[in-house]
Amino acid sequence: MQAFRPLPRTGVVFVTAEAVARGYRAGHPDWCNLGQGQPETGPLPGAPPRIGELTIDPSDHEYAPVGGLWELREAVAALYNHLYRRGLPSQYAAENVAISGGGRAALTRAVAALDQVNLGHFLPDYTAYEELLEIFRRVSPIPILLSREQAYRFTVEDLRREVLGRGLSALLMSNPCNPMGKLISGQDLARWVELGRELDCSLLIDEFYSQYVWNLGPGEPGPQVSAARYVEDVDADPVVIVDGLTKNWRYPGWRITWTVGPRRVIEAVESAGSFLDGGGSKPLQRAAIQLMEPRHVLAEGEAIRQAFSRKRQLMLQRVRELGMVLDREPDGTFYAFVSMRDLPERIADGMAFFRAALDHRVITVPGVFFDVNPGHRRAQRLSRFHQHARLSFGPSLDEVSRGLDRLGEMIRAFAA
């Protein structure tokens, strides 16, 4: 059918489909999914009890408002004010929040609301940005390369040079960054927000991993990180934040996310949602209100950091023992972005490593998927990340350990 174009699968979807063809299914005891982009969702020591059932009010079988249930919008605004804006004169309100059905829906709404602008994005970054930035032709995506040799550091002075030199009106980024875990926090994040305000460059910040923070920057009180802490005027500063239940609450299947920003932006995001997706699930939005209680959020975050820091320590130790190279230890997220360049030649490539790992019933994500190239406008040369892979410590500690054991067996077999 010539009316339709072929669409690529994003990283996790691609590797999962390849694994399914070899017998993988979610929860299969013989497989280790080190490619997964979601955290383990079961009980954690010290965490609030998991929600096991929902009671649905008959009125909630109707559509939810495109912008989300007002009560949930109020609860999200109150949470951000409690966590990040106590004592500040400018406070978020329900009008500063829009609810949507998943992170991609929230990001798609935000990009659809942009005018004809140059939008900067970093390399590497979240795989889904590639198709997202291609479909809206009003937006001109401008790649900003981060240097492996400099451990992917990028200062506010570097940002100023890019904004002024390339005429950027907006910047899309994940913080902490998926895949390599680089975190901008504290004084550095405050300066980024200040620069956005000074140069009127809108910062679209994906904060889905803001509870998974391991190394805080100077001046960052933590324990979770958000640009909301450094906004002066919630209705004037060009800072738009996207987050949700997916990672920081460990409820990815709920598909409940939110956008927080100036009222004018939220109105545009709502309008975009009216033709893009129509809004999220009303019963689940109702159920999510209780999860916005600050004590619940803080307890969940502490439990996450306790459990996932142990898995992070195991991951970093084992990948080094196996001969992989960490260009940068992850400051946040639950991923390690590793290089295979010192491994045996036949598996020194991320895609070759992925296919070999499937033979051992382990899933990984090749690094090329994070070389975001909207519309494939850049020449199809060998990716700078072709020797990299993203390994997830999102699964249980036992699954992560077994997966690393199997990768060790595989590497030793290729080295023999």
Which residues are covered by each model-predicted region?
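PLP-dependent enzyme catalytic core of the Aspartate aminotransferase-like
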Residues: 78, 82, 86, 161, ...
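Helix C-cap/helix->beta junction micro-motif
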Residues: 26, 166, 198-199, 322, ...
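N-terminal small-domain helix-loop-helix segment of the aminotransferase-like
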Residues: 5-101, 158, 292-296, 413-416
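Short beta-strand
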Residues: 27, 31-33, 242, 325-331
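Conserved glycine-rich beta-strand-loop-beta hairpin in the small C-terminal domain of fold type I
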Residues: 289, 305-316, 326-341
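Conserved core of the PLP fold type I
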Residues: 60-199, 210-234, 240, 328
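Conserved core segment of the aminotransferase class I/II
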Residues: 79, 134-135, 229-306, 313-319, ...
